[in-house]
A protein has these predicted regions:
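Contiguous, often N-terminal, cationic amphipathic patches that form binding interfaces
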Residues: 1-34, 38-42, 50-52, 56-71
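The alpha-helix within a helix-turn-helix
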Residues: 45
Length: 71
């Protein structure tokens, strides 16, 4: 399954919000050296109830708009 995600870094509290267009993920990490991407994968894995290894970024590794693949 592929999911469209908008990432909001530097959030005070990490959370995932489902919308009609996909997910908005507030990440409590800085977008430096992949820290925000790693935290994004952890949060999405927890949200969908799968292992972190089953979530990967298909498109948008360096931007705020991403496509995730959950297997």
């Amino acid at each position: 399954m592929k999911v469209s995600v908008t990432v909001k870094p530097y959030a005070r509290q990490a959370r995932v919000i489902a919308t009609d267009q996909g997910l908005i993920v507030y990440v409590d990490a800085a977008p430096v050296e992949g820290k925000a991407n790693r935290r994004l994968l952890e949060l999405c894995a927890r949200h969908f109830g799968v292992a972190r290894s089953q979530v990967r970024i298909c498109h948008g590794t360096s931007g705020r708009h991403k496509i995730l693949e959950i297997s």
